[in-house]
Design a protein with these regions (language model features):
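Membrane-interfacial helix-loop-helix
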Residues: 1-5, 31-108, 112, 119-126, ...
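Transmembrane helix boundary and interhelical junction motifs in multipass membrane proteins
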Residues: 6, 10-28, 105-116
Length: 157
């Protein structure tokens, strides 16, 4: 049940930035002895990935919405969009590197990068895989640091 609630909370936190996944994971880690560190980190990352995929898909499909299309009708904006897509097509490692940095470190904000990735039509599979790996490592680092700190305090106390 703990892992299911973790998944749901992390999906919600990916959709609503006011819900903090890291704080939830720390609270669960401190209060539950049934969920292991890596399981908690992976399930949290899976929930975050699902939520960010919703943002990605919404942004990807937004380019076909009437009011968005009208804003992109100017040659200058279409040229800029084509230029960015071209840059990323020439250097596929660049957007995935920024995405991994965002997923693992949090800068730039992953929500912003998810929207840009969708609008620039980055690979859906590449996006999901990179976010899943980055978030798993981020959450494992936070929970591992917390575990280390609680052990240290127990030895000192």
């Amino acid at each position: 049940m703990t892992l299911l609630l973790t998944f749901a909370t992390c999906v919600l936190s990916a959709l609503v930035p006011l819900v903090n996944a890291e704080a939830y994971l720390v609270a669960v880690s401190l209060t539950s002895s049934t969920a292991g560190l890596w399981a908690l980190a992976f399930v949290g990352a899976l929930g975050q990935t699902v939520g960010k995929l919703i943002w990605y898909e919404a942004a990807r499909r937004s380019l076909s919405w009437g009011w968005v299309r009208r804003r992109l009708e100017t040659p200058q904006r279409q040229e800029a969009l084509a230029r960015w897509r071209g840059r990323f097509a020439e250097r596929p490692w660049l957007p995935m590197s920024v995405l991994f940095l965002s997923a693992s470190v949090g800068l730039p904000p992953l929500l912003v990068i998810a929207v840009l990735a969708g609008q620039l039509h980055l690979s859906r599979v590449g996006f999901a895989f990179t976010v899943l790996v980055g978030r798993t490592l981020r959450f494992a680092a936070i929970l591992g640091g917390l575990d280390w700190l609680t052990e240290l305090l127990a030895r000192l106390g």
